[in-house]
Amino acid sequence: MLGASSSEEEDDDFQEDHDSLPIAQVKKRSLLSGAMTPRSSSPAPSDSVSQTNSLKRNNSSSQGRRKDSVQSQTPARSARIMSNVSKPIMQNSQEFDGDEEEGEEGSTTVVGSGDECGGPALSKEEQERMKAEREEEDHKKNLQMYMFLARCIAYPFNGQQTGDMARRQMKVNKQELARIRERFTLFLKGETNIAADEAFTKAIQSYFEVFLKSERVQKVVHAGGFSQHDFREVFRLNIEKRVRSLPDIEGLSKDTVLNSWLAKFDAIIKGDETDQNRNARGRSRNPQNAMSADAVLGKEQLYDVFQQILGVKKFEHQIIFNALQLDNPDEQAAAIRREFATREEALKDPIKMKRLTPKFVVKDMETLYMDEVRMSINTLIGNLETVPVTTRGATVGKRKDKSRSRSIEDLSLFNSLKRRTSSGSLNKGDSEDGDVTLTKSDVSLALSMEVVVMEVQGLKSVQPSKIVYCTMEVDGHKLQTDHAEASKPKWDTQGDFSTKNPLPVVKVKLYTEVKSMIAFEDKELGKVIIQPTPNCARSPEWYTMTLPKSSQDQNLKIRIAIRVEKPPNLKYCGYCYCIGRNAWKKWKKRFFCLVQVSQYAFAVCSFRQKKADPTEFIQLDGFTIDYMPESDPELSAQGGKHFFTAIKEGDELKFATDDENERHLWVQALYRATGQAYKPVPPKQSTIAPKAQGFQDKASKHGMDAMIQADSINFDHDHFYSDVQRLTLDFRINEPICSLGWFSPGQAFVLEEYSARYMVRGCFRHVTLLSNLLDKADDGLLIDPALIHYSFAFCASHVHGNRCMPDRQGPEGVGTVTLEEKEKFQEIKERLRVLLEKQITNFRYCFPFGRPEGALKGTLGLLERVLMKDVVSPVPPEEVRAVIRKCLEDAALVNYTRICNEAKIEQRMGIDVSPAQRIEDMIRVTEFCIDLLKENEEHHGEAFAWFSDLLSDHSEIFWSLYSVDLDSALEVQPHDSWDSFPLFQMLNDFLLSESSLKGGIFHNKIVQQFQPLVVRYIDLMEHSIAQAIDKGFSKEKWESRKEGCATSEDIYWKLDALHTFVIDLNWPEEDFRKYLQTKMKSLTSDMISKVSDCTFTAFDSWMQRAKKSTDYMLPSEVCVQINVMFSSKSRAVRVTVDSGEYKYQSKLDETLETMLKTMESCIQEKLHGVLESVLSRLARYDEGNPIGAILNIAPKPASIFNKLKTMAGDTSAQATTTARQPLTAQQSSGQIGNSYVTFFHGCTELLRQVIIDEIWVNGLFEHWYDNQMKSINEWLTERLQQSLSATQYISLSTIVKKVYQDFSLQGIDEERLNSKTYQSISRRLQLEESNSHIQEAAINGSAQGSVFPTSLGNATAAVSNMSSMVEGAGAKMFSLFK
């Protein structure tokens, strides 16, 4: 840095104090989160100079010199230097955790030991004194840095603070994580008022178990890398996949479900009102409110922020604020101009510049370095000139919204002049002829005035009821007040005027209204003429009015308040005596104005009254202002007491004022305008103590005067900046904002302004920032890789000489590179490579669940950038892939080791652990492994999109590590144990679902490993089922079970289980899969054949026991056997053989069909045999059959016994017998039919209830019905020539009626029931019924005729004749049925 020190000893001391400081920097705007919007190019480029801020940096890289320097220091200074020990480059963050703490705790004691320093051990008092000295020196240094930062905050001119950065979210800390877990626990227990359905509760349960309770999440929370937004995004992505996979619900969109779930999630995570209020109170206690930390901050807020960062106390800030006049923009702009002038002067001294020039990687860069310094200074000057001229207290860098000081024409003139002066200033260092010549129009002023007429006193010549008013006139423009009564002449009327004359004339006249017809104007009562200046007092004053000659008032006064608003370009004005060579050649008192045309153009102008343009003016460029300790007697005799002068080569101006304080104000204003390095000092005989002197005395009292008066060029701003940046980063990391290393807009704005104003080398800034960020990353904090990427790319472009900023380049695009920058960059590059490889290796734990978003992808991109040899040549893809492959190989070991530690596999490999427990442990480990790989694909697959094959190799390596434990667990399994099959199914299903792992090394290994086990298991199951068939059916009781008997259910359950097992295996190899299918078909066919054969044999045995009487009931065992056959048939479908487009029934299926048909025929035969037996019994009642005649006697008593009773005259007995005879006869005649109906009903109910195949039962019923009707019809056809007896008729009627009704209830089709056969039977039975009624009627008629004994013979003859007639009619009727 220019003028950083005056001797080699001071250089060495200063450099050693900063040997161990971190090196970092921040990229403009993009690096610092977009906090700057430069007005023009920054003067601190990567290649541009730090105005020799790198004072003797080449010495700092020499270890030998550092050692010699340390040994030559005092014990206190040696301890201070040695306490800052740099960390090893290759050391990882886990090693840092312990080593750093030990180094920090023991640095003060170890350094002071006799072994280390070669002297006696330091006492406790000396150590405390040394510690206090170090703290005092650090605090002084912080105060000095704060002074420079305060100047940057007070008057920024290289950019402005913007709020276009991405707003950072609130950080989730350990306490907040515990509260969030507690809220979710309460929700899952149902102790909240949040309504939720089962699906949402399951989603929350999964989120709680997988995410919130994850140890990885807890570690990242401790690292400050998670915000509530990250928590919400993880939940949103999780439920989005769930909801999107669900089928659509009519009337309910999936977006509505998602929004509802997210609203409930927000309600859970925020808690109730009590929790929210507690959190709000906790944040409000924070010194810097987290809600506004990333907002655009005002100056006072920025002061407060950096007071906290640097540990500056409020009173110290106030001292610095007052001493530096931070609220005075003119003073701040003047200080900047003085800084530039000092740097330009140092630049013109080749000898000094050569001594202060740092050591470059190429010797020829020294000349380029000088050009960069000059270019940077000119850039700063250009930036300063773009700042509009402002008044004291106005916001720098922004024009006023409403200004009455300038017209539109004046502003356009000012802007054009600003451009002219700006372009001229860029070349002023190269040529003295480049000065800008001002014109009178450039220094014109535009003032605004406010004239307020308040009241009049002494008005007695006017009647109290008269109306009076006032007029105001400035430069010909008149305004009038309101009317008032003469008794109370008071107003509150303000007149606004604008003028270009700094010495305006204000005329105020008092009038009274004259209502006379002949009066042309009102009467003037008095007037006053005021000549205000911009320095006049703003308080109201009483003025004596000039009265007309005829006025009767003696002492008429008016109270007027006048305020003249100074324009922004008028910096000071007042009356002075002046004489000069080129202007104001006569010593006289004139009204002077100091006018600022631009930031670098000032002029002293003299004005006269009623003249808008200056009479004369001189541009102050090149003048030096100073006090004149002694007055000029010759000039003081003509006027003026206190002198000061402005001197320039070829011209000299002498000024004098009547007031000493006025002189001091003029000197200070001119001193600010000239930008001179020399500060005028009041003469000793001065009795005026200026306000600034009081502030400096107060600063001196607190020991801060030296740092306040120090010149900025005497400090190494590179290392100052690195310290400020490091402390700011520490402060930012500790904020409740999830910053990931990004500065807030306010912090970034101030740091950028500092680096630009004091020309900190760009590469040095970024290297320092990289070092700080890597230190934070090594400490376990989470840093955004994009932030590191920006800085690294900037440094790489600078060091390799390929930059993309034309305005910051030297000749042919090459910039200066110091030796220290290159060495630090190589060191950072190696540290960064190690860190990135470590993060990629631990990607699941550094970036859990893919958060922060895009961080892993950015890390991979940054690794590729780090591996590049230079900026132009891209790194070969194979080299990048080799590094990532190695990282993922290590990641596989890390991930599986952590899973084993979590499952405690190593501890459970002892002898006391059973083989079954080993398999259970492996199943649990397998679940962890599958979940891990699924998470990798879900959360990190996108980041590894360009390296998907490497991620697949990582998974294979992961499974290869797993296979070692798998083999160990399988080796201890017994020969007849099949507990490992679920493990294979789990692995196989997952591997088949992953296209990258399907058919891979591990997949093929487990297939070959489990194939013999599968074959042995199926063979064993086949033998077991065959034995179960033989033993089971020999003892079977044929009790109904679900779809068969106990033995068949057991057999088929085993077959189904085996079949399901083979299907669930989902064997990946096609040949063995076909073998398993064929094997299962063969096995199933054999077992079904055995079951059906045994069942059919038992069925045949049971059916041989059947009887043909109505007492016989079909056994339920037979129905169970039929069910077994149907169960066998349903399973026989699985062994059908596919052949092209057709399906052919297997032999087994045909056999079962034949058996079922045979069983159906057998049952029908046995059931039909009972009907045949009944019909045979009824045939014995035929007419003409002797046995039938005997059997028919009972049902026909009316022909004999009724006659006897009638002849006996027992009429009462006859009536009773006649009434009871039909019922008794019917009951005795229908016994045969009722017994068959009972048999029929029991069989149908049994068949319907027990047999499971309703179709088969319906078919059986239909055939049985047809056969019954056919048999009955044939039986009746055989008896067409004879009528049925009562027994035959009643039995058949009962049988036909009940059979019809029962089969109708059983679901037989109506059309089938009403067949022709049934109709024929019905007609015959109806005819028999009619015949029976006729016979009964004939019998009843003969009974009535028997009361007359004489006619008994005639009645008998009549009955005989009727009988023959009926028989003849019957013969004719029966002939119709043939």
Swiss-Prot record:
List the effects observed when the gene is inactivated: Worms display increased adult life span and constitutive dauer formation. RNAi-mediated knockdown in ADL sensory neurons results in reduced octopamine inhibition of the aversive response when animals are exposed to 100% 1-octanol.
Protein origin, superkingdom: Eukaryota
Q: Which Gene Ontology biological process is one annotated for this entry? A: protein transport
Q: Which CDD domains match?
A: PH_CADPS
Ranges of compositional bias, category Basic and acidic residues: 123-138
One Gene Ontology term, aspect cellular component:
axon
What segments bear the compositional bias annotation Polar residues? 51-63, 70-95
Under Gene Ontology molecular function, one entry of this record is: calcium ion binding
Q: Where does the protein principally reside?
A: membrane
Gene3D superfamilies, A to Z: C2 domain (2.60.40.150), Pleckstrin-homology domain (PH domain)/Phosphotyrosine-binding domain (PTB) (2.30.29.30)
Q: Which residues form the PH domain?
A: 569-675
Coiled coil where?
A: 121-184
Q: Which residues form the C2 domain?
A: 430-547
Tell me the keywords, alphabetical order: Calcium, Coiled coil, Cytoplasmic vesicle, Exocytosis, Lipid-binding, Membrane, Metal-binding, Protein transport, Synapse, Transport
Q: Which PANTHER family match?
A: CALCIUM-DEPENDENT SECRETION ACTIVATOR
Q: What is this protein called?
A: Calcium-dependent secretion activator
| Organism placement in taxonomy | Eukaryota, Metazoa, Ecdysozoa, Nematoda, Chromadorea
